Amino acid sequence: MRGAANLTSAMEVAADLRQRILLGELKPGARLKIDDVASLCDVSHMPVRVALQALEAEGVLDVYPHRGAVIRAVDARFVRNTLELRAAIEVMLTEKCARLIDKDGLAELEALVLDFEQAAQSQDPLAVVSANLRLHEAINRVAENTEALRVLSRGRLLIQALRVRYGFGPGRVENVIVEHRALFRAIARKDERRAGEIARKHCEGARDELLALL
């Protein structure tokens, strides 16, 4: 039972740290000491160690012997490399989604497209980022490629934190709404090629616009 409790605590610690990183309370380059995190989250050392290992696996932390964990530094190269990799993978997954999706899946995507548009009206970067992630996760899941999803998850939190920090440039959210609608139509028509083209343009636009904000 103690092992299960430690695992639950570790999951809670990891979730807490993710939220703090996302909101900018913990910034790239910050060192996370086990003692400090344990005090912050009111847990023992073991759940903290497990949580830090999980975040390292997600590409969020670098862990060094005798130095502890450090939130990965984020610069233009990191953003460019991460989003170019995302583009390559999401094009593949989106094309497969267009081929495999069923009526229930389409209904879910349509609802998530609308959820994003409602979030956009709030002008809250965190709400927009979260709604965008839910939509793209739903598209990507249809392809049933867990290895691709694992790669996509690496470093994603750090990109999201940049979005929450810097927001979106003029007209970007409006462009995203247009692209989401076009992407949904292509998927609904099972037009794999067009869906892939839109996905690539969508990812490249996100990359270029975020780099311009740095």
What is each of the regions a protein language model found here?
Residues 8, 106-107, 171-174:
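Short helix-capping and inter-helix turn/linker motifs at the boundaries of alpha-helical repeat units
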Residues 22, 26, 94, 98-102, ...:
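Short, flexible helix-adjacent loops and helix caps
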Residues 56-57, 61-62, 155-157, 171-174:
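Mobile beta-alpha loop/short-helix "lid" or hinge segments that flank ligand
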